[in-house]
């Protein structure tokens, strides 16, 4: 027993000595920790810059996720890691100076501190930019944080994206980029948008939109023709006076609006002014040329210029244009006679080259003109002439009246059928609803009668219980109430209402309008309107068609008018070839 007690006391002393030794080792070996700042003991304070100061020119890629706020306004601190010589990884605080703020001088940007001017700079390469002045010009200065290569968007036809060169370098950028590029919404894009809006505003002020007055003021209707049109009309009148003087004394010369279609004819002899006016009217496709004797020129030079082959007429004689004599004749024909060479339908040549390939015909060009005698009305009337045509307007009155009657009949017949059918459906629905309502009232009356029986039964029971006191009324010392049963009156009215509903329903079904044609008449009524309209259309349709055909025929006949048809007569020239004269 004593040995066991000594052993336990010895174990307690050993445990106490071990705990004391552990506390001493902890106290002497590890030291104290900074309360609340365990990272400061491991990495030191950020402002101490244990990793040193990093130059902005070095290619450093900081990690923003571990950046800390520096109490100094001109420093930016980053936690960077590096591998040691023994293979361990060590982290230290490195500091980079922030860009200095350029103060403004007299409400103008301050002077620039750097002299590197970049031609382009993308907005994703820097965080902030500020304005500065250099040699009287305003620039944007910023510290680049990454590089970027310029790239195309969807091929070379799009604008080029701006690039950036130099990490952590202070660069300047002008407000306008010398190259056509985009900087991702930066200063260049903003100034370009402002310049475009300014140019659009200048254009709007320089060329204001025309605002027409709603009132059309009268003005004199004089001759307001361009010189070319006047020359064409004068030349045409000269030709008409030479061919038909009687018609030229009193006539109308009308030209079509829009693109003119000149008419070719063979070598018309006319004055120089006439030829100039005729040649000025060449602007469209030519017409077919059907003449008695037509002289064509053909050349088949393999090294020549193709001018085309005429295919809208038949050549009576073809001459090969290969010799110098023929070339001289071509030039002489144009100089003396002012003829044209038609090789295709849409082109006319005043002269042909030395070497050419094709088949051409000699012709002159006359304008597409309509000639109307002076005593006849103009087919294309003016506004005043249209307002006075009352006789033709009368022809449309029967047509309009017939269309109005037909439309009214169709609408009335269809509406009548639909309204009658709808009335029948509404009457049936109303009868059914009233019958359902009367049945509901009858059920309520049955409930009231059963409740009255229960109340009367309770009254008799209370009178028996209070018989010694003279009844329930004397016991309560109140006026006695009695039940007046009027359920018979309500039931009589409900029965009469149901009988009236049955009579109305029977009378509705006994109507011949609904029982006609074995019950099909209600379904045929909505189609009576369209059926009547079809019959009316078949009756009046031939008359309307005949009237419209006659009116269209009169319009076509009235628009026909005589055209210029020059008379062509083949006469031999001094070279032996036939020549046409007007």
UniProtKB/Swiss-Prot annotation:
Region listing for Immunosuppression, in residue ranges: 456-472
Residue numbers covered by motif CX6CC: 473-481
Coiled-coil annotated spans: 417-467, 477-513
Modified how: Specific enzymatic cleavages in vivo yield mature proteins. Envelope glycoproteins are synthesized as an inactive precursor that is N-glycosylated and processed likely by host cell furin or by a furin-like protease in the Golgi to yield the mature SU and TM proteins. The cleavage site between SU and TM requires the minimal sequence [KR]-X-[KR]-R.
The record's note on its domains: The 17 amino acids long immunosuppressive region is present in many retroviral envelope proteins. Synthetic peptides derived from this relatively conserved sequence inhibit immune function in vitro and in vivo.
Residues in compartment: Cytoplasmic: 541-582
Job of this protein: The surface protein (SU) attaches the virus to the host cell by binding to its receptor. This interaction triggers the refolding of the transmembrane protein (TM) and is thought to activate its fusogenic potential by unmasking its fusion peptide. Fusion occurs at the host cell plasma membrane. The transmembrane protein (TM) acts as a class I viral fusion protein. Under the current model, the protein has at least 3 conformational states: pre-fusion native state, pre-hairpin intermediate state, and post-fusion hairpin state. During viral and target cell membrane fusion, the coiled coil regions (heptad repeats) assume a trimer-of-hairpins structure, positioning the fusion peptide in close proximity to the C-terminal region of the ectodomain. The formation of this structure appears to drive apposition and subsequent fusion of viral and target cell membranes.
Protein's UniProt name: Envelope glycoprotein
Signal peptide boundaries: 1-35
Glycosylated residues in this chain: 241, 301, 314, 485
Motif (CXXC): 251-254
Chain intervals for the UniProt region annotation (Disordered): 562-582
Keywords, comma-separated and alphabetical: Cleavage on pair of basic residues, Coiled coil, Disulfide bond, Fusion of virus membrane with host cell membrane, Fusion of virus membrane with host membrane, Glycoprotein, Host cell membrane, Host membrane, Host-virus interaction, Lipoprotein, Membrane, Palmitate, Signal, Transmembrane, Transmembrane helix, Viral attachment to host cell, Viral envelope protein, Viral penetration into host cytoplasm, Virion, Virus entry into host cell
Protein's gene: env
């Amino acid at each position: 027993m004593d040995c066991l007690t000594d052993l336990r006391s010895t174990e307690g002393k050993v445990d106490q000595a071990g705990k004391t030794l552990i506390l001493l080792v902890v106290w002497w070996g590890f030291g104290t920790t900074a309360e609340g700042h365990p990272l400061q003991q491991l990495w030191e304070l950020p402002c101490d810059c244990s990793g040193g100061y990093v130059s902005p020119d070095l290619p450093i890629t900081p990690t923003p996720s571990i950046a800390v706020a520096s109490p100094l306004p001109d420093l930016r601190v980053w936690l960077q890691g590096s591998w040691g010589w023994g293979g361990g990884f060590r982290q230290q605080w490195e500091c980079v100076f922030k860009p200095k703020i350029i103060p403004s001088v007299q409400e103008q940007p301050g002077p620039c501190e750097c002299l590197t001017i970049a031609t382009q700079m993308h907005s994703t390469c820097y965080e902030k930019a500020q304005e500065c002045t250099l040699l009287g010009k305003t620039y944007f200065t910023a510290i680049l944080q990454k590089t970027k290569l310029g790239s195309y968007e969807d091929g070379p036809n799009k604008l080029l994206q701006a690039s950036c060169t130099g990490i952590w370098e202070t660069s300047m950028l002008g407000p306008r980029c010398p190259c056509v590029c985009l900087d991702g919404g930066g200063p260049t894009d903003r100034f370009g948008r402002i310049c475009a809006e300014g140019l659009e505003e200048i254009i709007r002020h320089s060329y204001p939109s025309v605002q027409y007055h709603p009132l059309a003021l009268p003005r004199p209707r004089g001759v307001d023709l361009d010189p070319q049109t006047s020359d064409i009309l004068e030349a045409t009148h000269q030709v008409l006076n030479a061919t038909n003087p009687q018609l030229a004394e009193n006539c109308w010369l009308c030209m079509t609006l829009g693109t003119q279609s000149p008419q070719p004819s063979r070598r018309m002899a006319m004055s120089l002014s006439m030829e100039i006016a005729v040649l000025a009217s060449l602007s469209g496709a030519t017409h077919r040329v059907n003449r008695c004797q037509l002289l064509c020129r053909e050349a088949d030079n393999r090294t020549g210029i193709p001018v085309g082959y005429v295919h809208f007429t038949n050549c009576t004689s073809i001459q090969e244009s290969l010799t110098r004599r023929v070339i001289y004749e071509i030039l002489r024909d144009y100089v003396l006679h002012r003829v044209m060479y038609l090789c295709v339908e849409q082109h006319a040549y005043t002269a042909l080259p030395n070497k050419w390939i094709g088949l051409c015909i000699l012709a002159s060009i006359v304008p597409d003109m309509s000639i109307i005698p002076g005593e006849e009305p103009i087919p294309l009337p003016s506004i005043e002439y249209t307002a006075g045509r009352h006789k033709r307007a009368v022809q449309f009155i029967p047509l309009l009246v017939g269309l109005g009657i037909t439309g009214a009949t169709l609408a009335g017949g269809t509406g009548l059928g639909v309204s009658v059918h709808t009335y029948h459906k509404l009457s049936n629905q109303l009868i059914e609803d009233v019958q359902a309502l009367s049945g509901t009232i009858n059920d309520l009356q049955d409930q009231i009668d059963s409740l009255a029986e229960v109340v009367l039964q309770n009254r008799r029971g209370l009178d028996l219980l209070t018989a010694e006191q003279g009844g329930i009324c004397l016991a309560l010392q109140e006026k006695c109430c009695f039940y007046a049963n009027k359920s018979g009156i309500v039931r009589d009215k409900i029965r009469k209402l149901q009988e009236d509903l049955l009579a109305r329903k029977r009378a509705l079904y006994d109507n011949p309008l609904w029982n006609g044609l074995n019950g099909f008449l209600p379904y045929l009524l909505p189609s009576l309107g369209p059926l009547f309209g079809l019959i009316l259309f078949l009756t009046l349709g031939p008359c309307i068609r005949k009237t419209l055909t006659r009116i269209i025929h009169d319009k076509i006949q009235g628009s026909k008018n005589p055209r210029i048809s020059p008379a062509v007569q083949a006469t031999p020239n001094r070279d032996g070839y036939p020549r046409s004269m007007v």
